[in-house]
């Protein structure tokens, strides 16, 4: 007896039920994966770190602005001030290397950030109670060492919080808030000195400093919980950081920092050029006004530079900033005797530092392996500190022995070297 179920021809069209199944299968195979929703980059954690940077900068800019006046009242010379600041910078650089090694552990980096902000605030404010120069040196050195410890931890925390595709904007926001603090700190110092005097003003700087520590605690509470891992001994990893694209990036950063002179030399150059035909006080005020313009330019450009870095690549923004620095050094070398003649050099250097500081952090975060971020930021921060110290020292010698123009020409050469070294740096995919 024949089978009652009809059998379709072998090469005939499939039945409707089979068509549906095949179509569904084809669609399932060809459909692209559903894209993940982008995380908002300006999250509570990013805002918390930005607030910490702003408040901390306000807090330590007050004693920094008033330190020359305090030391003068203690009978200290300008050479002693320079020595204290040089030692403090060296301690900060060493502490940044150590802080980077400790910050590879997510648990340690959180404790370092809170402790670093708190210690900097307390030690800086205690300078207002000193009775001798050596006490200033100890407290300033301790405050800067604590500041050095916290920097790699803060930068690594920000990389934990921000989505990778928005590193540029996140670090740009942090730099903008830091620069706002650099503007607000001296203005607050001027106001407080008129109300309570130099020593009390320095003592009151503890308030914004401790508020910065609270802001970091807030940011940590909004940081994704780190995966548990075995407690590792503290060690600074160097070899992997100096290899490949990360190594090339560090060489480029080192070259830049060897030409990244302290902004006080910009102010000195402007003061000397503006002084002929003017009272010294007027020249100083005009030079400080140009310095404020420098900080405003850096603040305004930081977030847009980060946004461009997210779209076009942080190394492109870094290269642009380095090139602008080279152009500003040419302006400082040529000089001028009016504010209008000097303003372009200050504005160019302000835009340049806004681009460079934003893109340096974002580049390190994007190029460094996740497990080495703390060490990478530590090496980076150490290079910054020691490079700045070397740049200012050599430029100062050339300034005194030959001429200011020679010093700025020397610095411009380092910008060219940094641009060449930056070639070939690639972000991690």
Where are these predicted regions, by residue range?
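Residue-level signature of mid-helix packing/kink "hotspots" within the transmembrane helices
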Residues: 89-97, 182-183, 295-303, 388-389
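Helix-to-loop junctions at the C-terminal end of transmembrane segments
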Residues: 95-108, 193, 300-313, 399
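Juxtamembrane intracellular "pre-TM" segments in multi-pass secondary transporters
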Residues: 24-43, 221-252
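Helix-loop junctions on the cytosolic side of multi-pass membrane transporters
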Residues: 160, 217-230, 424-429
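Helix-loop boundary and gating motifs at the non-cytosolic
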Residues: 35-89, 247-277, 283, 287
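Symmetry-related core transmembrane helices of the 12-TM Major Facilitator Superfamily/SLC fold
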Residues: 200-217, 406-424
């Amino acid at each position: 007896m024949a089978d009652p179920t009809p059998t379709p021809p072998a090469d005939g069209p499939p039945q409707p039920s089979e068509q549906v199944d095949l179509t569904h299968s084809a669609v399932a195979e060809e459909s692209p994966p559903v894209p993940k929703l982008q995380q908002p980059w300006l999250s509570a954690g990013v805002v918390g770190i930005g607030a910490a940077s702003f408040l901390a900068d306000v807090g330590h800019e007050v004693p920094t602005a008033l330190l020359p006046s305090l030391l003068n009242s203690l009978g200290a010379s300008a050479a002693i001030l320079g020595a204290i600041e040089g030692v403090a910078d060296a301690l900060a650089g060493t502490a940044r290397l150590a802080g980077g090694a400790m910050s590879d552990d997510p648990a340690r980096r959180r404790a370092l950030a809170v402790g670093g902000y708190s210690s900097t605030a307390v030690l800086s404010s205690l300078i207002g109670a000193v009775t001798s120069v050596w006490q200033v040196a100890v407290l300033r050195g301790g405050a800067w060492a604590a500041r050095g410890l916290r920097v790699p931890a803060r930068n690594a925390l920000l990389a934990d919080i921000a989505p990778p595709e928005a590193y540029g904007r996140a670090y740009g926001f942090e730099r903008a808030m830091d620069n706002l603090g650099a503007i607000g700190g001296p203005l607050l110092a001027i106001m407080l000195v008129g109300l309570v005097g130099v020593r009390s003003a320095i003592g009151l700087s503890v308030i914004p400093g401790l508020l910065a520590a609270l802001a970091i605690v807030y940011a940590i509470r909004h940081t994704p919980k780190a995966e548990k891992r075995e407690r590792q001994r503290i060690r600074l990893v160097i070899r992997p950081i100096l290899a490949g694209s990360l190594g090339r990036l560090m060489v480029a950063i080192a070259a830049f920092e060897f030409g990244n002179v302290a902004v006080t030399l910009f102010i000195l150059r402007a003061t000397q050029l503006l002084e002929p035909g003017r009272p010294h006080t007027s020249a100083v005020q005009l030079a400080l006004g140009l310095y404020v313009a420098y900080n405003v330019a850096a603040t305004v450009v930081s977030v847009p530079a980060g946004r461009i870095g997210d779209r076009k690549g942080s190394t492109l923004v870094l290269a642009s900033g380095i090139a602008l620095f080279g152009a500003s050094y040419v302006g400082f070398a040529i000089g001028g005797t009016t504010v209008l003649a000097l303003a372009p050099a200050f504005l160019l250097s302000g835009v340049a530092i806004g681009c460079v500081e934003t893109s340096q952090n974002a580049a390190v975060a994007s190029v460094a392996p996740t497990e080495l971020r703390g060490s990478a930021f530590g090496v980076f921060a150490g290079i910054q500190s020691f490079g700045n110290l070397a740049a200012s020292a050599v430029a100062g010698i050339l300034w005194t022995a030959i001429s200011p123009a020679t010093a700025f020409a020397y610095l411009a050469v380092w910008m060219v070297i940094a641009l060449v070294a930056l070639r070939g740096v690639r972000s991690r995919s």
